[in-house]
Amino acid sequence: MQFNLKNPNHYGVIKTPEKTYQRYDFLCEYYNVTPEQALQSGTRASGRKPNLPGSETCKPVKDMTFEDIWAAQSRNTPEDIFQFYLDQGAWSSFRQTVRHLELQHMHNFVLRNLIRPGIYFCEYGCGVAPFSTTILLSCPKDFNIDISISDVDGCEHFLFAEWKLKKIIKDRGLKNVNLHVKPVKARGLPKYDKPIDSLVIFEVLEHVLSPIETLNNIIEQMSPDALLLENFIKHDREEDDDLGPDLKSAADERGKFYEMVEDNFLLLSNNSVFADPNGTRIWRKLVKE
């Protein structure tokens, strides 16, 4: 099964047999903005303070940098850190949408290796659920799949992602797609309805409190021969730098995390952790006796 969007270029549209989606349609509808406002609000720039709109599920955020939002209160406990993702409002809804529309070719390429009919697919730390979005916009109308999304409970980009995926399922009449919404709690990791056959955790691990606990929870719920797509961004920072949402606790576990990955998975892609530390890799779960 291969996934190939008709026009995955920077200025293109996404055409399905049922509907044509313009580049920022979902943001424009959910947040009542123009395409120009969507692009401006989601384009990364140093020191920027976008005026982010509110929605039915969040308040507006304006005159603050990303760093200002992080520094607005202490971020010492799991609850403090999770609150950051609520405090940022629609910031990640816009930023991640703009970024991942530019990564559409990559989505297509990796999903060819991860997706087949009848599987239970999980997008962990999903943000706006870009990989799940690509699946739903690319699959045949009769395609059978369970999709589970997980992110911080109650954060705006997670709520936006849920709305977006449900809208695509309804628009396209995807009757054989089952969507499962599994939030991550400050002191509780999600449990899934079925064994996970394929999981994506993309640009997430550097933000989680404990990558090792996260991986353990995932491994315990994976099917034999399950596939894992991951990356774990490594920043070169001074010891006393404020890492913000790139958590020190996550960075401290990076080495042991990859030891655990190599003990439990076989690397399928040709980019090792040593040669390409910030690369995106695909692994297959080992079947242990």
Question: How would you label these PLM feature ranges?
Answer:
Residues 2-192, 215, 229-287:
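Conserved N-terminal segment of class I S-adenosyl-L-methionine
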Residues 200:
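A conserved beta-strand element that flanks and buttresses the S-adenosyl-L-methionine
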Residues 204:
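Hydrophobic adenine-recognition pocket in adenosine-nucleotide-binding enzymes
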Residues 207-211:
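Di-metal (Zn2+ and/or Mg2+/Mn2+) metal-binding site signature of metallo-dependent hydrolases
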Residues 213-227:
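A short glycine-rich, Lys/Arg-flanked "PGG" loop and its adjoining helix->strand segment in the class I
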